[in-house]
């Protein structure tokens, strides 16, 4: 009953309120699929039939590969998988108090995450390394994650460049024939204010 209420509320948001989509190609894709699109406002409203048709195309289950096959993560059929939070900006220590995260902090959290058996994934950005320019962070994070953990990896899909770089690195690790196309998307501001 609670799941159904959540589903219905989600459908109402997608149909009645809609989402901001700030990419022309994304607007094209949704419009071609039959969604209501306002290009001037960069806004899309998704009919529940369209949403459910897309959801029906998703596989019922899949395996998220890890560098160590013993750490592959099965997704689906009521399997539970835990991942760490991502995008944390600050670290706190007894010695230095609260401060912006660094690449060294990221490496330390990655090592800690690797040792936690109850966490199945290595997070995409366990801590934001503020000592690295934002445009380069993914290029510093992912190689370190590949080197410091053999768990299944996640990387941010914040735009085409980051996603393409992550897929390229994944193919170097898993082989050219791999299809590393899984990403968790979240939108903290679906109605962004102007």
Task: Name these PLM-found stretches.
Residues 100-194:
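Helix-rich catalytic cores of soluble enzyme domains
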Residues 1-105:
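Acidic/polar, glycine-rich intrinsically disordered N-terminal extensions of enzymes
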